[in-house]
């Protein structure tokens, strides 16, 4: 089962989204819906906490890429935090590690988005 949860953090001027489980084709549809809803609010800073993400397929990766591009067009920034070795390998294999700011912790990701 795949879930996307918004994490409340009053100390951060942005949004933290936690992805959990297996983001296969069905999960990619859930992710697409959540990201569409999130985009409507025009956030400027978004951290995706991937610690509990076990798998993400190409459709899910495509949703993150599209969200990132849309946010950047509007001056926003995206960072990934706590990315597992397997997910990081998939991003690197897809040559997406240059597109996303990847950080060891949520705190590091938040700090990186606050710069600039």
Predicted regions and their residues:
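Short beta-strand/loop segment at the start of cytosolic alpha/beta domains
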Residues: 1-18
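Conserved catalytic submotifs in the C-terminal HATPase_c
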Residues: 11, 51, 107
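Residues at the C-termini of beta-strands that transition into short coil/loop
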Residues: 20, 106
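Amphipathic alpha-helical interaction surfaces in cytosolic regulatory modules
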Residues: 22-100
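Acidic phosphotransfer microenvironment of two-component signaling modules
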Residues: 85, 107-108
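Short acidic-hydrophobic, aromatic-tinged amphipathic segments that line or gate anion-handling sites
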Residues: 101-105
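A short, charged, amphipathic alpha-helix used as a generic interaction element across diverse proteins
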Residues: 109, 113-116
């Amino acid at each position: 089962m795949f879930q996307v949860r918004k994490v409340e953090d009053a100390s951060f001027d942005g949004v933290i989204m936690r992805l959990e489980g297996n983001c296969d084709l069905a999960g990619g549809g859930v992710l697409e819906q959540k990201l569409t809803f999130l985009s409507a609010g025009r956030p400027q800073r978004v951290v995706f906490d991937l610690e509990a993400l076990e798998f993400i397929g190409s459709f899910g990766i495509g949703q993150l890429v599209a969200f990132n591009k849309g946010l950047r067009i509007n001056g926003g920034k995206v960072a990934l935090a706590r990315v597992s070795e397997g997910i990081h390998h998939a991003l690197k294999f897809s040559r997406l590690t240059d597109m996303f700011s990847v950080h060891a912790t949520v705190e590091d990701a938040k700090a990186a988005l606050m710069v600039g």
